[in-house]
Amino acid sequence: MQQSKEERVHDVFEKISDKYDVMNSVISFQRHKAWRKETMRIMDVKPGSKALDVCCGTADWTIALAGAVGEDGKVYGLDFSENMLAVGKQKVEALELKQVELIHGNAMELPYEDNTFDYVTIGFGLRNVPDYMQVLKEMTRVVKPGGKVICLETSQPTMIGFRQGYVLYFKYIMPLFGKMFAKSYKEYSWLQESASTFPGMKELACMFEEAGLKNVQVKPFTFGVAAMHLGIKPESK
Protein backbone atom coordinates (compact mmCIF):
# COMPACT_ATOMS: atom_id res chain seq x y z
CA MET A 1 0.00 0.00 0.00
CA GLN A 2 1.31 3.45 -0.93
CA GLN A 3 2.46 5.60 1.98
CA SER A 4 0.82 8.94 2.68
CA LYS A 5 3.01 12.03 2.49
CA GLU A 6 3.04 12.24 6.29
CA GLU A 7 4.15 8.61 6.67
CA ARG A 8 6.83 8.96 4.01
CA VAL A 9 8.24 12.16 5.49
CA HIS A 10 8.27 10.61 8.97
CA ASP A 11 10.24 7.62 7.68
CA VAL A 12 12.69 9.90 5.87
CA PHE A 13 13.54 11.98 8.93
CA GLU A 14 13.68 9.02 11.29
CA LYS A 15 16.33 7.51 8.99
CA ILE A 16 18.47 10.58 8.28
CA SER A 17 18.43 12.17 11.75
CA ASP A 18 22.03 11.32 12.64
CA LYS A 19 23.38 12.87 9.41
CA TYR A 20 20.86 15.68 9.03
CA ASP A 21 23.02 18.54 10.33
CA VAL A 22 26.02 17.54 8.21
CA MET A 23 23.87 17.16 5.12
CA ASN A 24 22.23 20.55 5.66
CA SER A 25 25.65 22.16 5.46
CA VAL A 26 26.69 20.09 2.43
CA ILE A 27 23.49 20.69 0.47
CA SER A 28 23.29 24.44 1.12
CA PHE A 29 27.07 25.00 0.99
CA GLN A 30 26.77 26.31 4.58
CA ARG A 31 24.42 29.08 3.44
CA HIS A 32 21.51 27.94 5.65
CA LYS A 33 23.29 29.38 8.69
CA ALA A 34 23.59 32.82 7.10
CA TRP A 35 19.96 32.67 5.97
CA ARG A 36 18.81 31.91 9.50
CA LYS A 37 21.03 34.62 10.99
CA GLU A 38 19.58 37.26 8.66
CA THR A 39 16.06 36.02 9.36
CA MET A 40 16.69 36.38 13.10
CA ARG A 41 17.94 39.92 12.52
CA ILE A 42 14.73 40.82 10.70
CA MET A 43 12.61 39.14 13.38
CA ASP A 44 14.17 41.34 16.09
CA VAL A 45 13.39 38.88 18.89
CA LYS A 46 12.91 40.60 22.25
CA PRO A 47 14.48 39.23 25.46
CA GLY A 48 11.97 37.52 27.72
CA SER A 49 9.72 36.53 24.80
CA LYS A 50 7.95 33.22 24.30
CA ALA A 51 8.57 31.37 21.03
CA LEU A 52 7.54 28.16 19.28
CA ASP A 53 9.70 26.50 16.63
CA VAL A 54 7.48 24.20 14.56
CA CYS A 55 9.08 21.23 12.78
CA CYS A 56 12.17 22.02 14.84
CA GLY A 57 14.10 18.93 13.74
CA THR A 58 17.50 18.85 15.43
CA ALA A 59 16.73 22.18 17.13
CA ASP A 60 19.22 24.54 15.47
CA TRP A 61 16.67 27.35 15.13
CA THR A 62 15.21 26.51 18.53
CA ILE A 63 18.64 27.05 20.06
CA ALA A 64 19.13 30.34 18.17
CA LEU A 65 15.76 31.53 19.50
CA ALA A 66 16.78 30.53 23.02
CA GLY A 67 19.84 32.74 22.74
CA ALA A 68 17.67 35.65 21.64
CA VAL A 69 14.95 35.35 24.31
CA GLY A 70 17.51 34.76 27.06
CA GLU A 71 17.05 33.03 30.40
CA ASP A 72 13.88 35.00 31.14
CA GLY A 73 12.22 33.77 27.95
CA LYS A 74 10.89 30.40 26.89
CA VAL A 75 11.23 28.44 23.64
CA TYR A 76 9.36 25.31 22.65
CA GLY A 77 10.54 23.13 19.78
CA LEU A 78 8.02 20.72 18.26
CA ASP A 79 8.65 17.89 15.80
CA PHE A 80 7.02 14.60 14.86
CA SER A 81 10.32 12.71 14.43
CA GLU A 82 11.52 11.32 17.73
CA ASN A 83 14.95 10.58 16.27
CA MET A 84 15.40 14.19 15.14
CA LEU A 85 14.27 15.38 18.58
CA ALA A 86 16.78 13.06 20.25
CA VAL A 87 19.61 14.80 18.37
CA GLY A 88 18.16 18.17 19.33
CA LYS A 89 17.87 17.22 22.99
CA GLN A 90 21.55 16.28 23.08
CA LYS A 91 22.45 19.76 21.81
CA VAL A 92 20.11 21.53 24.23
CA GLU A 93 21.43 19.55 27.20
CA ALA A 94 25.05 20.16 26.17
CA LEU A 95 24.36 23.91 26.12
CA GLU A 96 22.37 23.71 29.40
CA LEU A 97 19.50 25.72 27.95
CA LYS A 98 16.92 25.61 30.72
CA GLN A 99 14.55 27.86 28.76
CA VAL A 100 14.10 25.25 25.99
CA GLU A 101 11.55 22.44 25.94
CA LEU A 102 11.36 19.99 23.04
CA ILE A 103 8.01 18.35 22.33
CA HIS A 104 6.98 15.36 20.20
CA GLY A 105 3.92 16.60 18.31
CA ASN A 106 2.14 17.29 15.03
CA ALA A 107 2.41 20.64 13.21
CA MET A 108 -1.05 20.07 11.76
CA GLU A 109 -2.60 20.18 15.22
CA LEU A 110 -0.46 22.24 17.59
CA PRO A 111 -1.02 21.34 21.27
CA TYR A 112 -1.20 24.95 22.46
CA GLU A 113 -3.90 27.47 23.33
CA ASP A 114 -4.77 30.39 21.07
CA ASN A 115 -2.64 33.55 21.40
CA THR A 116 0.21 31.91 23.32
CA PHE A 117 3.48 32.90 21.60
CA ASP A 118 5.26 36.09 20.57
CA TYR A 119 7.03 34.32 17.69
CA VAL A 120 6.20 31.12 15.82
CA THR A 121 8.80 29.84 13.36
CA ILE A 122 9.15 26.99 10.89
CA GLY A 123 12.47 26.36 9.17
CA PHE A 124 12.77 24.03 6.18
CA GLY A 125 9.76 22.11 7.41
CA LEU A 126 6.69 23.60 5.77
CA ARG A 127 7.38 21.86 2.46
CA ASN A 128 7.22 18.49 4.24
CA VAL A 129 3.81 18.81 5.90
CA PRO A 130 0.64 17.28 4.37
CA ASP A 131 -1.23 20.62 4.21
CA TYR A 132 0.69 23.90 4.04
CA MET A 133 -2.36 26.06 4.77
CA GLN A 134 -3.46 24.02 7.76
CA VAL A 135 -0.03 24.46 9.37
CA LEU A 136 0.05 28.20 8.62
CA LYS A 137 -3.40 28.58 10.16
CA GLU A 138 -2.28 26.67 13.25
CA MET A 139 0.81 28.85 13.58
CA THR A 140 -1.38 31.94 13.24
CA ARG A 141 -3.82 30.60 15.81
CA VAL A 142 -1.20 30.11 18.54
CA VAL A 143 0.71 33.38 17.99
CA LYS A 144 -0.42 36.40 20.00
CA PRO A 145 -2.07 39.41 18.32
CA GLY A 146 0.85 41.56 17.19
CA GLY A 147 3.10 38.49 17.20
CA LYS A 148 5.11 37.22 14.23
CA VAL A 149 4.86 34.04 12.16
CA ILE A 150 8.03 33.27 10.22
CA CYS A 151 8.87 30.68 7.60
CA LEU A 152 12.39 30.07 6.26
CA GLU A 153 12.20 27.62 3.39
CA THR A 154 13.53 26.59 0.02
CA SER A 155 11.92 28.48 -2.84
CA GLN A 156 11.77 28.63 -6.63
CA PRO A 157 14.50 30.79 -8.22
CA THR A 158 13.21 32.99 -11.03
CA MET A 159 16.49 34.07 -12.67
CA ILE A 160 16.82 32.47 -16.11
CA GLY A 161 19.76 30.07 -16.25
CA PHE A 162 20.18 29.92 -12.50
CA ARG A 163 16.77 28.29 -12.12
CA GLN A 164 17.69 25.51 -14.55
CA GLY A 165 20.94 24.86 -12.69
CA TYR A 166 19.08 24.80 -9.39
CA VAL A 167 16.60 22.22 -10.70
CA LEU A 168 19.41 20.00 -11.98
CA TYR A 169 21.28 20.31 -8.68
CA PHE A 170 18.27 19.36 -6.57
CA LYS A 171 17.15 16.55 -8.88
CA TYR A 172 20.47 14.84 -9.56
CA ILE A 173 23.33 16.16 -7.43
CA MET A 174 21.65 16.44 -4.02
CA PRO A 175 20.53 12.79 -3.91
CA LEU A 176 24.09 11.77 -4.84
CA PHE A 177 25.41 13.83 -1.92
CA GLY A 178 22.89 11.99 0.23
CA LYS A 179 24.26 8.67 -0.95
CA MET A 180 27.89 9.75 -0.48
CA PHE A 181 27.64 11.42 2.92
CA ALA A 182 24.60 9.82 4.54
CA LYS A 183 24.08 6.54 2.63
CA SER A 184 20.54 7.78 1.93
CA TYR A 185 19.92 8.26 -1.81
CA LYS A 186 16.21 7.40 -1.53
CA GLU A 187 15.60 9.78 1.38
CA TYR A 188 17.36 12.72 -0.27
CA SER A 189 15.46 12.05 -3.48
CA TRP A 190 12.32 12.77 -1.44
CA LEU A 191 13.75 16.07 -0.19
CA GLN A 192 14.30 17.28 -3.74
CA GLU A 193 10.75 16.23 -4.65
CA SER A 194 9.30 18.24 -1.78
CA ALA A 195 11.41 21.28 -2.66
CA SER A 196 10.50 21.16 -6.36
CA THR A 197 6.74 21.21 -5.70
CA PHE A 198 6.79 23.85 -2.96
CA PRO A 199 5.07 27.19 -3.76
CA GLY A 200 7.11 30.12 -5.01
CA MET A 201 7.60 33.30 -3.00
CA LYS A 202 4.55 35.20 -4.26
CA GLU A 203 2.24 32.22 -3.82
CA LEU A 204 3.46 31.59 -0.28
CA ALA A 205 3.02 35.28 0.58
CA CYS A 206 -0.61 34.99 -0.54
CA MET A 207 -1.00 31.92 1.64
CA PHE A 208 0.30 33.88 4.64
CA GLU A 209 -2.38 36.49 4.02
CA GLU A 210 -5.05 33.83 3.55
CA ALA A 211 -4.02 32.34 6.90
CA GLY A 212 -4.90 35.68 8.50
CA LEU A 213 -1.50 37.41 8.66
CA LYS A 214 -0.82 41.03 7.71
CA ASN A 215 2.17 43.13 6.62
CA VAL A 216 3.78 40.10 5.00
CA GLN A 217 7.49 40.57 4.30
CA VAL A 218 9.41 38.41 1.83
CA LYS A 219 13.20 38.19 1.78
CA PRO A 220 14.83 36.02 -0.92
CA PHE A 221 18.24 34.47 -0.31
CA THR A 222 20.91 33.44 -2.83
CA PHE A 223 18.98 34.30 -6.01
CA GLY A 224 15.77 32.85 -4.58
CA VAL A 225 17.08 29.40 -3.63
CA ALA A 226 15.51 30.07 -0.23
CA ALA A 227 13.24 32.75 1.17
CA MET A 228 11.97 34.15 4.44
CA HIS A 229 8.29 35.00 4.84
CA LEU A 230 7.20 36.97 7.90
CA GLY A 231 3.65 37.95 8.77
CA ILE A 232 2.07 39.68 11.76
CA LYS A 233 -1.16 38.60 13.44
CA PRO A 234 -3.55 41.57 13.59
CA GLU A 235 -4.34 43.05 16.97
CA SER A 236 -7.70 42.01 18.40
CA LYS A 237 -10.49 44.50 17.75
Swiss-Prot record:
UniProt-annotated binding residues for S-adenosyl-L-methionine: 58, 79, 106-107
Pathway(s) where this gene product acts: Quinol/quinone metabolism; menaquinone biosynthesis; menaquinol from 1,4-dihydroxy-2-naphthoate: step 2/2
PROSITE patterns recorded: SAM_MT_UBIE, UBIE_1, UBIE_2
Coiled-coil spans in chain: none
Catalytic activity, EC: 2.1.1.163
GO biological process, one term: methylation
Catalytically driven reaction(s): a 2-demethylmenaquinol + S-adenosyl-L-methionine = a menaquinol + S-adenosyl-L-homocysteine + H(+)
SUPFAM superfamilies xref list: S-adenosyl-L-methionine-dependent methyltransferases
EC main group: transferase
Name the record gives this protein: Demethylmenaquinone methyltransferase
Gene: menG
